């Protein structure tokens, strides 16, 4: 029998704040999320690690969509 593919949950985030004059760790977190320029949008797998990164820079990003 073929294994069923489970639809992975995703979260779409957009960078809405600039990392200028922010601690280096916040800039690195944005780069880790794939966001390094304003208004970039990325769709990421919804994992606890990604959620933690979003929470760490919640003042710089906006969650657009959760599926």
Curated annotation (Swiss-Prot):
Keyword Ribonucleoprotein among record annotations: yes
Superkingdom of source: Bacteria
GO CC terms of this entry: cytosolic large ribosomal subunit
Gene Ontology molecular functions: structural constituent of ribosome
GO biological process: translation
One Pfam family cited in the UniProt record for this chain: Ribosomal_L30
InterPro entries: Ribo_uL30_ferredoxin-like_sf (IPR036919), Ribosomal_uL30_bac-type (IPR005996), Ribosomal_uL30_ferredoxin-like (IPR016082)
Keywords from the UniProt entry: Ribonucleoprotein, Ribosomal protein
Family recorded in the similarity comment: Belongs to the universal ribosomal protein uL30 family.
Subunit structure: Part of the 50S ribosomal subunit.
Identification of the protein by name: Large ribosomal subunit protein uL30
């Amino acid at each position: 029998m073929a294994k069923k593919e489970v639809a992975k949950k995703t979260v779409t985030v957009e960078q809405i704040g600039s990392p200028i004059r922010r601690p280096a760790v916040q800039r690195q977190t944005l780069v880790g999320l794939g966001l390094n320029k304003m208004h970039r949008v990325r769709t990421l797998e919804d994992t606890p690690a990604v959620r933690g990164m979003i929470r760490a820079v919640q003042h710089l990003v906006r969650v657009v969509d959760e599926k």
